[in-house]
């Protein structure tokens, strides 16, 4: 088998990159339509469907939000601009590890909910109690978590729900309610995944 000259291979790869255009990727309107990255492609259709990962810090400029990861999917391209939809978020593992220490209790809850405007979401809440707690207290905290998340979904639109979850407002409300059962270190909405959008 004839060997391909490494220089020719490198030149061919370089030519492929020359043929690609760079598209500017923007966050959805409810995140301010800010620029969140660049992505290369040789034709616009190949850009659609790509997932862009960024952080809430990069979107808002708030340096305290670097642990909040955001995921957006490109759904439309106009010229050199690529527009996205929110697909989910999660807290960085290192941040979660920093909260969970010895002799604390981590209480998780996973709930499928539908927002006021028909978006189906999988929402994962997390509460950290400052000490080891009894199983009955753990169940009570999880019930509070579920009640609050389901109530929020019924009352809020998709954009309102997502913003309250990622900016910490929903977690703060959860903490206020759950600490009536046992003293807490932290409460967070640690992950959201968009399962389905309402049918047009």
From Swiss-Prot:
- Family from the record: Belongs to the eukaryotic ribosomal protein eS1 family.
Cited Pfam families: Ribosomal_S3Ae
Biological process (GO) annotations? translation
Naming one, the record's GO cellular component terms include: ribonucleoprotein complex
Q: Which key words tag this protein in UniProt? A: Ribonucleoprotein, Ribosomal protein
Transmembrane ranges, per UniProt, are none
A GO molecular function term, named singly, is: structural constituent of ribosome
Q: Which PROSITE patterns match?
A: RIBOSOMAL_S3AE
Entry protein name: Small ribosomal subunit protein eS1
Signal sequence span is none
Top-rank taxon, per record: Archaea
């Amino acid at each position: 088998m004839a060997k391909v000259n490494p220089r020719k291979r490198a030149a061919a790869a370089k030519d492929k990159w020359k043929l690609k255009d760079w598209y500017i990727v923007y966050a959805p309107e409810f995140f301010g339509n800010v620029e969140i990255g660049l992505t290369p492609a040789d034709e616009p259709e190949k850009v659609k469907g790509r997932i862009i990962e960024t952080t809430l810090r990069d979107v808002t400029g708030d340096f305290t939000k670097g642990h909040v990861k955001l995921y957006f999917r490109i759904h439309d391209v106009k010229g050199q601009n690529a527009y996205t939809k929110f697909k989910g978020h999660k807290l960085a593992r290192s941040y979660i590890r920093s909260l969970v220490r010895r002799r604390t209790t981590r209480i998780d809850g996973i709930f499928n909910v539908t927002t006021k405007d028909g978006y189906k979401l999988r929402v994962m809440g997390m509460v950290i109690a400052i000490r080891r707690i009894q199983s009955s207290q753990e169940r009570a905290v999880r019930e509070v978590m579920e009640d609050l998340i389901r109530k929020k979904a019924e009352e809020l639109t998709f954009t309102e729900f997502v913003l309250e979850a990622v900016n910490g407002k929903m977690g703060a409300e959860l903490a206020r309610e759950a600490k009536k059962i046992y003293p807490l270190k932290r409460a967070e909405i640690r992950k959201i995944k968009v399962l389905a959008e309402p049918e047009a």
